[in-house]
Amino acid sequence: MADLAQHESARAPAEVLQPPGLPGLTRLIGKALGVVSRLTGKDRYDDFRLERVLGLQFLVTPTVFNPKLPRTGAFFADFIESHRLAAEAEVLDMGTGSGVCAIFAARHARRVVAVDINAAAVRCARLNAALNHVEHRSEVRHGDLFAPVAGERFDLILFNPPFLRGIPRDDRDRAWRSNDIAERFAAGVRDHLKPGGAALVLLSSFGGAGPFLEEFRRQGLLVSTVAERGFLTERLAIFRLEPLPDGGAA
């Protein structure tokens, strides 16, 4: 597998996602922008949309997470594309949505399995795999977290999780909030990685990164920052998770 930790940050993971600017002002601006985004982007969630990410086209169907409305999808895809995976790599894309990260991984890896709990997202990701000519190296499965890949191990796991704590209101809201995703994902990572494998998880300063980082360490995962990007009201970071040999807390 390609070395995806070549550009580790010197800062501690907990420091990376400190919101830019004054915290109170940042939260206020973020809430205002969130309202505007929901109002102006509603049609892009409720209708069929054709979006372009790094030169590739993606059909986004209703109730499926749109990779162009938040910044996360394009940021993660850009990282995957610029750190090309080894040709023999086997990859799991957790919570694939429209399939953006899975498809960019499948352009280079030998095999990609994508998983989503939203049945509409599963159908959407399959369409996009065919649209981008990687259906022969990718498979999309329906189910919750690691359930569809029980007993399987991968060189790399990708995850752009719901950042917010709470009960999702509908299928689309599952991409934004969950009460226990940090705990359940962290508990299952080790059992689904091959020796020498790693997971990449994208988190935002808008969400509660603390519970994720705490759970990763509690489950004996070494956490390092491999990419970060700052915006006016938000910071994004990609964290690399590696199981510690003794399984102890990091």
Regions found by a protein language model. Name each.
Residues 2-53:
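N-terminal auxiliary segments of SAM/dcSAM-dependent transferases
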Residues 6-20, 46-48, 113-116, 123, ...:
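Short low-complexity stretches enriched in small and charged residues
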Residues 26-27, 54, 59, 80, ...:
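A short alpha-helix capping/helix-coil boundary motif
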Residues 31, 38-90, 94-101, 124, ...:
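SAM-dependent Rossmann-like transferase core, predominantly class I methyltransferases
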Residues 69-73, 94, 118, 177-182:
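Short, conserved glycine- and acidic-residue-centered signature motifs
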Residues 77-166:
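Conserved SAM/SAH cofactor-binding pocket of Class I
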Residues 119-122, 134, 138-243:
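S-adenosylmethionine
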